[in-house]
């Protein structure tokens, strides 16, 4: 299994990095990585690591076809736009953040068959421990809808305010 996971990781890393704000709609589901090169003080080490080439993602995620998470009949690669939709959702989150600039982000992705999606995502996270996956929780969150708000605002939304729906949550007092 390690060789298969490594193959998926290598394939993602070989993909051209596209400015996050320029990702167009395309068909497929799969795995993606986001990279940061900006000047936010919290990410100085990450920016330094990515100064010459993009070697350390800030976030890794996956997008499965509709129905895929629950084992239902899933849409085919040719009919789902799950991956581009998810990446573009992330672009919207970055754009709404008051202290981030979309121009400082790049994305790589790999369209794969459903069976490889979870393997690819977990292998990338294990390999890189991206800060928005492993340290600063909440970037990948969706608006939970009414009646489902429990807990406090995510650490990500506390450090990077701007997502309107995150303001529904009580503020955190443990993030400085």
Which positions does each model-derived feature cover?
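Boundary/linker segments flanking structured domains
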Residues: 1-58, 62-176
